């Protein structure tokens, strides 16, 4: 070959060499020094620049479950140039989040997280130090206290029961009105406002603006939040996407800005009526702690209250709305299950009084139905991403500090090693042999609210709320769809997975008042 031909090929050779060096550097950069006796987590080879973005696809819970079947409970992928460790298997996840909880309690510093309450959210903030832990306990205790505390002027056992009973009965009336007017309804639009009113009353008491246009706009657009705070969101791993036209990201920013402004306004208005000798809601309790902060260096400066209320509101809103919506659609899909719940309610509660939280132990089939909703739909497919706080190891694999961690809850709930026929909807799997109680061993295998030090602070109130809403709705109503209408149970991926829209649900009164 002539020298001139070599010269003409030089640009191509230089380009090929540059690409090779870049890929080699990226591979080397993604590898870490592994201590003796440990290994790097296994995983498939990714593509240059994008890593495993195409492999993860639009349904990461499914694609990463398939990869776990090939590579095991601890595997590693790359999204862009960022390494991500994916954990599957109940025992492996418990080992990481519970037994080694301090190692895995961090949050990755993701771009989408910085947009939530201006990057100061207790739930999404990378901070995991002692001040974060103390504020988390405070928020958890406040939420729990105003769930179980009782109003001496009320017949209800606690504030939560009082608020849910009121809203559930109002929802029954709304659904009957929709039936009288158009003969059918779409569940989400009916349920979302009622659930928001419950957590709003818990947070703000009588100061919550139930019917304000501002509040309704926020709750009806909450999907703009859950669609963006997801495991595998490309904008978190490819910075260039933040500067390109991105309607979903724009809606996400707008939602967060509007929500913070709404909470700031409501908190400020509530402060005008604050009486430290009459604490009747969560925000009042936080005001009192804020005053203690000024007096003796407590945990909550006043500016942090909005951030904490934001986390509490979020913990008690979207999960409950999604659970009730899925429940209604699965009830119309499996009418025999609905019939068994009706029979249990008629036997235990009857029709002369309203269901109460104290009825839970006597309504095991309803409880089993709810557990199967959580397991079968796995509508929180991943926890909010974790990160490691220090170099650690798991199952013989080295995981360095600040490694992003995905927890695949969907895989746990559909693991054939844990569940017989995991893709069949069967509430009976959670009952003891005589069907008289919940099988605790089975119920503890369901993952929906995370585990360990980042477990959802609203788990207990959310479970109580879902139970009482469904008990009251099903005491009064029978849900169905017209003959020939098929319900779409295909979930739409997000932080919480929503079912497809169904505008033809019907609710018929079971008895005359």
From Swiss-Prot:
List of residues binding substrate: 225
> CDD domains attached here?
CYP1A (cd20676)
MF (Gene Ontology): caffeine oxidase activity; demethylase activity; enzyme binding; estrogen 16-alpha-hydroxylase activity; estrogen 2-hydroxylase activity; heme binding; hydroperoxy icosatetraenoate dehydratase activity; iron ion binding
Q: Which Pfam families match?
A: p450
Q: Residues that bind heme, according to the entry?
A: 456
Q: Name one GO cellular component term.
A: endoplasmic reticulum membrane
Establish whether keyword Lipid metabolism is in the entry. Answer: yes
Q: Which InterPro entries match?
A: Cyt_P450 (IPR001128), Cyt_P450_CS (IPR017972), Cyt_P450_E_grp-I (IPR002401), Cyt_P450_E_grp-I_CYP1 (IPR008066), Cyt_P450_sf (IPR036396)
Can the keyword Amino-acid biosynthesis be found in this entry's annotation?
Answer: no
Cofactor(s), by name: heme
Q: Name the keywords, alphabetized.
A: Endoplasmic reticulum, Fatty acid metabolism, Glycoprotein, Heme, Iron, Lipid metabolism, Lyase, Membrane, Metal-binding, Microsome, Monooxygenase, Oxidoreductase, Steroid metabolism, Sterol metabolism
Where do glycans attach? 68
What is this enzyme's catalytic activity, as reactions? an organic molecule + reduced [NADPH--hemoprotein reductase] + O2 = an alcohol + oxidized [NADPH--hemoprotein reductase] + H2O + H(+); 17beta-estradiol + reduced [NADPH--hemoprotein reductase] + O2 = 2-hydroxy-17beta-estradiol + oxidized [NADPH--hemoprotein reductase] + H2O + H(+); 17beta-estradiol + reduced [NADPH--hemoprotein reductase] + O2 = 4-hydroxy-17beta-estradiol + oxidized [NADPH--hemoprotein reductase] + H2O + H(+); estrone + reduced [NADPH--hemoprotein reductase] + O2 = 2-hydroxyestrone + oxidized [NADPH--hemoprotein reductase] + H2O + H(+)
Query: Which compartments is it annotated to reside in?
Result: Endoplasmic reticulum membrane; Microsome membrane
* Protein induction: By 3-methylcholanthrene (3MC).
What are its E.C. numbers? 1.14.14.1, 4.2.1.152
> What does the entry give for GO biological process?
alkaloid metabolic process; arachidonate metabolic process; cellular respiration; cellular response to cadmium ion; cholesterol metabolic process; dibenzo-p-dioxin metabolic process; estrogen metabolic process; hydrogen peroxide biosynthetic process
Q: In which pathway does it act?
A: Cofactor metabolism; retinol metabolism; Steroid metabolism; cholesterol metabolism; Lipid metabolism; arachidonate metabolism
Q: How does it sit in the membrane?
A: Peripheral membrane protein
What job does this protein perform?
A cytochrome P450 monooxygenase involved in the metabolism of various endogenous substrates, including fatty acids, steroid hormones and vitamins. Mechanistically, uses molecular oxygen inserting one oxygen atom into a substrate, and reducing the second into a water molecule, with two electrons provided by NADPH via cytochrome P450 reductase (NADPH--hemoprotein reductase). Catalyzes the hydroxylation of carbon-hydrogen bonds. Exhibits high catalytic activity for the formation of hydroxyestrogens from estrone (E1) and 17beta-estradiol (E2), namely 2-hydroxy E1 and E2.
Q: How does it assemble?
A: Interacts with PGRMC1; the interaction requires PGRMC1 homodimerization.
Tell me the protein family, please: Belongs to the cytochrome P450 family.
Q: What is this protein called?
A: Cytochrome P450 1A2
Q: Which organism is it from?
A: Mus musculus
Gene encoding the protein: Cyp1a2
């Amino acid at each position: 070959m002539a020298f001139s031909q070599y010269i003409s090929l030089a640009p191509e050779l230089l380009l090929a060499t540059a690409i090779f060096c870049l890929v080699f550097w990226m591979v080397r950069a993604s590898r870490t020094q592994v201590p003796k006796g440990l290994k790097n987590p296994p995983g498939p080879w990714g593509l240059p620049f994008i890593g495993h973005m195409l492999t993860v696809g639009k349904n990461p819970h499914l694609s990463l479950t398939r990869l776990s079947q090939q590579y095991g409970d601890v595997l590693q992928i790359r999204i862009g140039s960022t390494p991500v460790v994916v954990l599957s298997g109940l025992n492996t996840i418990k080992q990481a989040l519970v037994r080694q909880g301090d190692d895995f309690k961090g949050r990755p510093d993701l771009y989408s997280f910085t947009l939530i309450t201006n990057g100061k959210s207790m739930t999404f903030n990378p901070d995991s130090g002692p001040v974060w832990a103390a504020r988390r306990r405070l928020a958890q205790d406040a939420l729990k206290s105003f769930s179980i505390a009782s109003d001496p002027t009320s017949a209800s056992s606690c504030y939560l029961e009082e608020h849910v009973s009121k809203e559930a009965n109002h929802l029954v009336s709304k659904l009957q009105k929709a039936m009288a007017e158009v003969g059918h309804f779409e569940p989400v639009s009916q349920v979302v406002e009622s659930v928001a009113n419950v957590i709003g009353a818990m947070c703000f008491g009588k100061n919550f603006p139930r019917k304000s246009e501002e509040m309704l706009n926020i709750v009806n657009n909450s999907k703009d939040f859950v669609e963006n705070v997801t495991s595998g969101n490309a904008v978190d791993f490819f910075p260039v996407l933040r500067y390109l036209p991105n309607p979903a990201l724009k809606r996400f920013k707008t939602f967060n800005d509007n929500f913070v402004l709404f909470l700031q306004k409501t908190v400020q208005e509530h402060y005008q009526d604050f009486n430290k000798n009459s604490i009747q809601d969560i925000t009042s309790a936080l005001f009192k702690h804020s005053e203690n902060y000024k007096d003796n260096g407590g945990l909550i400066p006043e500016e942090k209250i909005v951030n904490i209320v934001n986390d509490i509101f979020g913990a008690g809103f979207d999960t409950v709305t999604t659970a009730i919506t899925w429940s209604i659609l699965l009830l119309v899909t499996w009418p025999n299950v609905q019939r068994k719940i009706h029979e249990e309610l008629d036997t235990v509660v009857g029709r002369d009084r309203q269901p109460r939280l104290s009825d839970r132990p006597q309504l095991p089939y309803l409880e089993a139905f709810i557990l199967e909703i959580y397991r079968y739909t796995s509508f929180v497919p991943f926890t909010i991403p974790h990160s490691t706080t220090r170099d650690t190891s798991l199952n013989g694999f080295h995981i360095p500090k600040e490694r992003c961690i995905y927890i695949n809850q969907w895989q746990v709930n559909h693991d054939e090693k844990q569940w017989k026929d995991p893709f069949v909807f069967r509430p009976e799997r959670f009952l003891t042999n005589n069907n008289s109680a919940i099988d605790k061993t089975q119920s503890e295998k369901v993952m929906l609210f995370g585990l360990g030090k980042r477990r959802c602070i609203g788990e207990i109130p959310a479970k109580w709320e879902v139970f009482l809403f469904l008990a009251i709705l099903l005491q009064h109503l029978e849900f169905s769809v017209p003959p020939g209408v098929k319900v779409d149970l295909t979930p739409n991926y997000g932080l919480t997975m929503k079912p497809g829209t169904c505008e033809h649900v019907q609710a018929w009164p079971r008895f005359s008042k």
